[in-house]
Amino acid sequence: MKMARMLKCRFVLPAGLLVLCIVQKSFAAQGGSQWLVSPKLLKHANLKISWENKLPIKKTERLEQLFILGNRLYAISNQNYTASLNRENGNMIFGRVVAPDGLPVEGLKLYDDVLISIAGTKVIEIDPQSGDQRKAADVGFSIACPAARNSSYFYLSGADKRLHILRAEDKVQIFEVAVENESMITSVIAEETFVIFATEAGNVVSIMPNMPRRLWQFDAAGGIAGPIVKDGISLFFASKDTNVYRVDIVGLPLRKQLAWKFQTAGVLDKAPRVTQAVVYQYVPGKGVTAIDKGGGKPLWSVPGGADLLAEAKDKAYVITKDRTLVVMDNIKAKKLYSVNFAEVSIYAANIVDSKIYIADERGRIACLQPVE
C-alpha cells in the first residue's frame, strides 16, 4: 500500500508557464480524515487501498471529472486544471490548465500518442506526456460531441447537424454528410474501413471513411443516449425508446444485424458499460441493471445504482446515488456486501480491469483493488 501522498502546489507564471513543486508528506502527519474510504470498511468488502493522492486544486476549485484513457487516469476540475496520473501507482504524469476558465474541456480522447480535446470551435491536440498543446485548429463551427479520427481524417459533428470530415494533417474539410431527418449527430466512431455515427432521432448510420457513401443504417424508435460502444463486431447502445441494443456488423459488404434488444423500465440517458460477459445499464429513477452480453437476458438490478465502477472475475462493483458501494455476484445474481462511500462524489467507470478509482471534489483520489 502506498503510505504517502504527493502534495503539489501549482503556480502559473506571467508567461503562462506552469510549475509544479512536489513535497512528500505522510498520512500520519496530517489532520482530518486520513482516507477517502476507511480501510476497515473496505476490508469488509475484500478490498484494499492501492494508492491515494491529492491534487493541487484551489480552495475555490472543485474536481468534476475522473476517467480512464489507456494506462492513465485523468482528472479535470471546474477551472480546467487537468491532471494525468499513472493509474498503477498514482504518480502524476502532468498537471496543468489546458483551456481557459469558462471554456469546458470536453470529450478528451486518446489516438495513438495524441490527446484530442474539443473546446468550442477548436480541435486541440495535446502531448500525453507533458500536457503541452501540440496543435490547435479553429474549424469554424461549433462541435457538438467528442471528435473521432483514424489515420487519415477527423470526423466532427457540428451544431449545424452535419458530420464534417477533415483531413488529419491540415484540418481541411473534404466532405460532409447528414441524415435525411436533419437530426443532431451525437456520437461518432471512426475505423480505417468504416465510420459509424448516431443521432438524437435514433439513427445509427455507417458510411465509407473517405467518401459520402452510406453502408447501412439502423433506426431505433428513440434518440441514442450517450456514445455507441463498439466491442469487436458488436455495437451496444442505449435509446430513449427505453431499449438497450446489441447490433452486430457482419458480412462482406458490411451490413448490420440486430442480435438483441432489452427493454428497461425507463427512458435511458446514458450509454451502457460493456465488459467481457455483461452489459451494465443505468436506468434513471430505477438503478443499474446487468444484462447478459450474449443473449440480452436480465441478470440482476441494483435499486438506486448509479454506475459500474469495476468488475473482478464474477463480481461487479456498483456505486449508488446515496454513495454506497454495492458488490454483486454476477453468477448467483445476488448482493454480497456494501460499503459506505459517503466521501466519494466522483468516480471513473473501469471496464478494463478490477481497479476502482474514486475521488471527492477537493481533489483526493484513491485506487482500490480486490484482495485475492
Language-model-detected regions and their locations in the chain:
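Bacterial N-terminal signal peptides that target proteins for export
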Residues: 3-13
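Sec-dependent N-terminal signal peptides
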Residues: 13-19
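A short helix->beta-strand "capping" segment at the edge of beta-propeller domains
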Residues: 36-60
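A short beta-strand motif characteristic of beta-propeller blades
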Residues: 51-56, 91-97, 132-137, 172-178, ...
